[in-house]
Curated annotation (Swiss-Prot):
Keywords: DNA replication, Endonuclease, Hydrolase, Nuclease
The keyword Transferase appears for this protein: no
Similarity comment: family membership: Belongs to the phage GPA family.
Enzyme Commission number(s) of this protein: 3.1.-.-
InterPro entries assigned: Replication_gene_A-like
Domain of life: Bacteria
Job description of the protein: Possible endonuclease which induces a single-strand cut and initiates DNA replication.
Protein name: Probable replication endonuclease from prophage-like region
Entry annotation: catalytic residues: Y498 (o-(5'-phospho-dna)-tyrosine intermediate), Y502 (o-(5'-phospho-dna)-tyrosine intermediate)
Length: 804
């Protein structure tokens, strides 16, 4: 049908639509041609984009709302179906684990190990996996039942002994529940916990003060009672409050109460830093004792102390060394001393410490020869109840959870009782005592003692009596494991040679690199790295001289002699320094380093301290500490036969941070150091020779290179503070000499061996690393150490041994 026929059929007449108002409207047809659609405007585009953005934002908000609901407001108890499913899963797992443990009890031990903290479970699981990989199921099961299970039982006993009832009560306070997991905490966590403990102590102080703030008339005894309440809270944490012995309540008090100590004591108990030091020390000790309980401190694992403590000590040394290198000491006159050089020149240097003790022992030997005394070498060991691990690395069944500190206290108490009985019997001796650890960290003593020949048998018998009187039944007829004595035969060696090895291996292992320890199987030089953290962690005094004058006065006399030599200048060498000839003779002996003469001039051995001619003088420090009290520092020396005191520390030094070196701050020697990676400053213009030769005040600089020693000495002492500071700044800007290119020559076989050793240590063994080592460089190996190639073998950097 055509279009016209359709119009006729529908009665449509074009003549009837002569006007626009009666013309038919166009029908709405979605299938129109795209060209006939109205064009899209800018406003319609904006509306469309806005609607799309709103839709995306709405979807994002709905997703976030679902996440927030699931995380904070959704609980399984609100969904019974899911809750029932989760409960069924847990019940089925528990039944399966129970069935497995019923048929295989070893699964219970493995589950208990995995439930321990990481510092316990990780090393134990490594050993368990090793035994499992051997393919010997009986040996594997026996190891779990005979070694791991007793270790876990001992660990629980150690934890119970560490967490006392009062300590648990303190942990019940709000925010202090972290005290229950103190050994598992890191340093940051201990810092946060110490802040909470300090806040708790502050609240206790506010509650204890009561109405004291409202009254002006407060008696000192009322303040002391307030201090007692805060100190009682501190004692609940197994921490002794500061000045506790002087301020605590006593029935028969001979001296008046020092009320001036209360402010400093309270300031410390309210300080977060003070609590951090106490809690961190407690954390390290508790953690170490837990590792001893599971046999991780022994000759089979880590001798003397845990590997974690050794790594912590290495990092502490590295930080201390960086601190010393970045600071210097400055006095009022502007003189500066490098702090690293000062530390190395003091007794903190292991070499100086070892030399001083060896000189002292040699002096005792010479005095003994002069007096006709004999020398005896003793070894005293604690009973078996103090030893946590056997020599084969298995737990000791007789161990009573005794700590390393308790073993040291046992020996100290035993020695005090013996000394009292010896003096009561009229016997005397003098010598040196060395404390060192067994492979499990338990303390034992070596003593080199000098005595009269007629008293040797009596002293030895009395010492043996006190050394074996506890747990005597475990020794039987053989007392060797607890007590040994050996009369030193001059034909075999001198007393100094007997004790030299024990002194060296407990300091830095000097000269003992080739000797192997019978107890640990390692070099004695390497053992020194483990002994120092052991003594520091457990607060064990390693060396002790007795029966001789104090060595601090000896050090002060040597310091005074050096100061006098610099001040005398042109005076004849050996001129008297002190007016009193007796005192000057003691100073001369100390300056010469002869301990024998020094001891005899002081009065000799076995002389009470009140009869020594020269003693160390102390004074109250003028500058207060951070807690408001004034400490005590060494002033110099004094003598009861001379008036006044002699000051050896007249110059006061302050520790300041070193100035930044311009050459290190900006590589281009520009006007200032860049604060970004690149420096956009222009290069510094070269100064002319006249500006270089002028000082800061415009005066020409003096040429010190052409002066002789006397002129240079006079010129340096006549300089002002400003000129000294300028000279020090000029010396810092001196460019260091660059080393020439250096490269070791090795064969192809040695190169392959070097690559293999690098790969075995975890490195890539690439040509770049090999070339770096051959040119004298080093590669960091972790814990502040570096490896380098020397004498055709890889070595580990141990430069810290020469500094600490």
């Amino acid at each position: 049908m055509s279009h016209a026929d359709m119009n006729n059929c529908c009665g449509f007449n074009e003549a009837a639509a002569a006007f626009s108002w009666n013309s038919p409207k166009k029908a709405i047809n979605p299938y129109l041609d795209p060209a006939e659609v109205a064009p899209v405007s800018a406003l319609s585009n904006l509306i469309t984009l806005y609607a799309a953005d709103n839709e995306q934002e709405q979807l994002r908000r709905e997703a976030l709302s679902d996440q927030v609901w699931e995380r904070y407001f959704f609980y399984e108890s609100r969904d019974p179906v899911q809750h029932e499913m989760e409960q069924d899963k847990l019940i089925s797992r528990a039944k399966l684990a129970h069935e497995q443990q019923r048929f295989n009890p070893d699964m219970v031990i493995l589950a208990d190990v995995n439930a321990q903290p990481s510092h316990i479970s990780k090393p134990l699981m490594q050993r368990i996996e090793y035994f499992s990989s051997l393919g010997r199921p009986k040996a594997y099961s026996r190891y779990l039942r005979e070694t791991i299970k007793p270790c876990l039982e001992r660990l629980e006993h150690v934890r119970d002994s560490q967490l006392s009832a009062s300590f648990r009560f303190m942990a019940s306070h709000v925010g202090l529940d972290g005290l229950l997991i103190l050994p598992e905490m890191s340093q940051d966590q201990v810092k946060r916990l110490s802040t909470l403990v300090a806040a708790h102590m502050s609240m206790c102080l506010d509650a204890a003060c009561g109405d004291l703030y409202a009254t002006d008339d407060v008696k000192p005894e009322e303040i002391r009672k307030t201090w007692e309440k805060v100190a009682a809270e501190t004692l609940r944490l197994d921490v002794i409050p500061p000045a506790f012995e002087q301020l605590r309540r006593k029935r028969n008090r001979r001296k008046p109460v020092p009320y001036e100590l209360i402010p400093g004591s309270l300031a410390r108990m309210l300080c977060a830093d003070w609590w951090y030091r106490k809690l961190w020390k407690m954390r390290c000790e508790w953690r170490e004792e837990q590792l001893r309980a599971v046999c991780l401190v022994s000759k089979k694992a880590s001798p003397y102390v845990s590997y974690e403590a050794v790594m912590h000590k290495r990092e502490q040394r590295r930080k201390s060394l960086e601190f010393f290198r970045s600071h210097e000491l400055v006095n009022e006159e502007g003189d500066t001393l490098d702090m690293e050089d000062v530390v190395n020149a003091s007794s903190s240097n292991p070499a100086h410490r070892r030399n001083e003790m060896m000189a002292c022992v040699k002096g005792l030997e010479l005095i003994a020869e002069m007096r006709g005394d004999c020398a005896v070498f003793y070894t005293i060991t604690c009973p078996s109840r103090f030893h946590s691990t056997l020599n084969n690395g298995r737990p000791n069944p007789t161990w009573t959870n005794a700590t390393v500190r308790q073993s040291s206290d046992y020996l100290v108490g035993m020695f005090a009782a013996f000394r009292k009985a010896m003096h009561k019997a009229g016997l005397r001796w003098y010598g040196v005592r060395v404390a060192e650890p067994h492979h499990d960290g338990t303390v034992h003593w070596h003593l080199l003692c000098f005595m009269r020949k007629k008293d040797r048998r009596a002293i030895t018998a009395l010492l043996r009596k006190f050394a074996i009187r506890e747990d005597r039944e475990e020794l039987g007829n053989n007392t060797g494991p607890r007590f040994k004595s050996e009369l030193i035969n001059p034909r075999k060696g001198t007393p100094t040679s007997y004790i030299a090895k024990y002194i060296s291996k407990n300091i830095d292992g000097r000269g003992l690199a080739g000797e192997i320890s019978k107890e640990t199987g390692k070099s004695l030089r390497d053992n020194a790295e483990y002994v120092n953290p052991w003594a520091s962690l457990h607060r064990v005094q390693q060396f002790r001289f007795f029966g001789i004058p104090g060595r601090q006065a000896y050090r002060e006399l040597r310091l005074l002699a050096g100061q006098a030599a610099r001040q005398q200048g042109d005076k004849k060498a050996g001129a008297p320094v002190l007016d009193n000839p007796r005192l000057d003779a003691i100073l001369a002996a100390a300056d010469a380093g002869c301990f024998a003469t020094y001891i005899m001039r002081q009065g000799g051995v076995l002389v009470p301290r009140k009869y020594h001619l020269i003693r160390t003088a102390y004074e109250i420090n003028e500058e207060p500490t951070a807690y408001g009290d004034h400490g005590i520092r060494i002033y110099g020396i004094w003598s009861p036969i001379a008036e006044g005191k002699i000051c050896t520390h007249a110059v006061k030094w302050k520790m300041v941070r070193k100035a930044v070196d311009v050459q290190e701050a900006a590589a281009d020697q520009g006007a200032c150091a860049p604060w970004t990676r690149g420096n956009n400053c222009l290069l510094a213009e070269n100064l002319n020779q006249q500006e270089k030769d002028k000082s800061a005040d415009g005066n020409p600089r003096t040429d010190i290179t052409s002066m002789d020693d006397k002129e240079l000495h006079d010129y340096l002492h006549s300089m002002s503070k400003k000129e000294r500071r300028e000279l020090a700044a000029r010396l810092r800007l001196v460019k260091p000499k660059r080393r020439k290119d250096y490269k070791q020559r090795i064969t192809d076989h040695q190169r392959l061996q070097l690559v293999y050793e690098l790969k075995s240590r975890g490195f890539d063994g690439s040509e770049k690393e090999v070339d770096l080592l051959l040119r004298g460089g080093s590669i960091p190996s972790g814990a502040g150490l570096r490896i380098f190639y020397r004498n055709q073998r890889l070595q580990e950097d141990d430069q810290w041994r020469n500094l600490y």
